[in-house]
Amino acid sequence: MVVGIEGIITKKEPTFIIVKCASGLSYGIFISLFCSAKIQTQEKHEFFITQIIKEDSNKFYGFLDKDEQKMFEMLLKVNGVGANTAMAVCSSLDVNSFYKALSLGDESVLKKVPGIGPKSAKRIIVELSDTKTKLENVSDDKSEALAALLTLGFKQEKIISVLASAQATGTSELIKEALKKLG
């Protein structure tokens, strides 16, 4: 099972990239539009990978952010939601918007995602309702890091942008990584 890939992006389409690793192997990876907006060709990146093996395919789904990967994997557990629909949600909603819609039971937010109708939106809300508390805890680390960095005098827009691309988990690690990037 592949859980991570690091390498140079040699080809980029809106939701698909090819990454060439130091070993010489190249991998095709499906990504969200949010991920796509943060990367360029000829840049080196590390991706968290969710590998889906089926009888006729072996696909990699890549994420720069561990929270987005968790969201994708949770959506896959919902009856009737496949990888394409889960990736459409990841491309249409950022992690915080998804968590907020889930915690409020707001089906209208999910219905705006291409491929999700009223029944699917309701099913996602119902089946993931027991994970609401887990979701709220994931974003708490970033909220705490944001508050700490604001007290240090950094501008909110810059902090949010840095935290969105942060790879670290846990409040203290997020703050350390953000401080390095904020200078």
UniProtKB/Swiss-Prot annotation:
SMART domains: HhH1. Residues 139 are annotated as: Flexible linker. Pfam families: HHH_5, RuvA_C, RuvA_N. Residues 1-64 are annotated as: Domain I. It is found in: Cytoplasm. One of its GO terms (biological process) is DNA repair. Residues 139-183 are annotated as: Domain III. GO terms for cellular component: cytoplasm; Holliday junction helicase complex; Holliday junction resolvase complex. Residues 65-139 are annotated as: Domain II. Keywords: Cytoplasm, DNA damage, DNA recombination, DNA repair, DNA-binding. GO terms for molecular function: ATP binding; four-way junction DNA binding; four-way junction helicase activity. Has three domains with a flexible linker between the domains II and III and assumes an 'L' shape. Domain III is highly mobile and contacts RuvB. NCBIfam families: ruvA. Belongs to the RuvA family. The RuvA-RuvB-RuvC complex processes Holliday junction (HJ) DNA during genetic recombination and DNA repair, while the RuvA-RuvB complex plays an important role in the rescue of blocked DNA replication forks via replication fork reversal (RFR). RuvA specifically binds to HJ cruciform DNA, conferring on it an open structure. The RuvB hexamer acts as an ATP-dependent pump, pulling dsDNA into and through the RuvAB complex. HJ branch migration allows RuvC to scan DNA until it finds its consensus sequence, where it cleaves and resolves the cruciform DNA. HAMAP family: DNA_HJ_migration_RuvA. Homotetramer. Forms an RuvA(8)-RuvB(12)-Holliday junction (HJ) complex. HJ DNA is sandwiched between 2 RuvA tetramers; dsDNA enters through RuvA and exits via RuvB. An RuvB hexamer assembles on each DNA strand where it exits the tetramer. Each RuvB hexamer is contacted by two RuvA subunits (via domain III) on 2 adjacent RuvB subunits; this complex drives branch migration. In the full resolvosome a probable DNA-RuvA(4)-RuvB(12)-RuvC(2) complex forms which resolves the HJ. This is Holliday junction branch migration complex subunit RuvA. It comes from Campylobacter jejuni subsp. jejuni serotype O:23/36 (strain 81-176). The gene is ruvA.
